[in-house]
C-alpha cells in the first residue's frame, strides 16, 4: 500500500468536491 498514493487520490477527490 502506497500511503502517498492514497493521500494523492484523497487530495484529488477533495479538490473535485
Curated annotation (Swiss-Prot):
Protein name: Bombolitin-5
Subcellular location: Secreted
Main location: secreted
Homology family: Belongs to the MCD family. Bombolitin subfamily.
Function: Mast cell degranulating peptide. Its mast cell degranulation activity may be related to the activation of G-protein coupled receptors in mast cells as well as interaction with other proteins located in cell endosomal membranes in the mast cells.
Lineage: Eukaryota, Metazoa, Ecdysozoa, Arthropoda, Hexapoda
GO terms under cellular component: extracellular region
Provenance organism: Bombus pensylvanicus (American bumblebee)
Tissue specificity statement from the Swiss-Prot or TrEMBL entry: Expressed by the venom gland.
Amino acid at each position: 500500500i502506497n500511503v502517498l498514493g492514497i493521500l494523492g487520490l484523497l487530495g484529488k477527490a477533495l479538490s473535485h468536491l
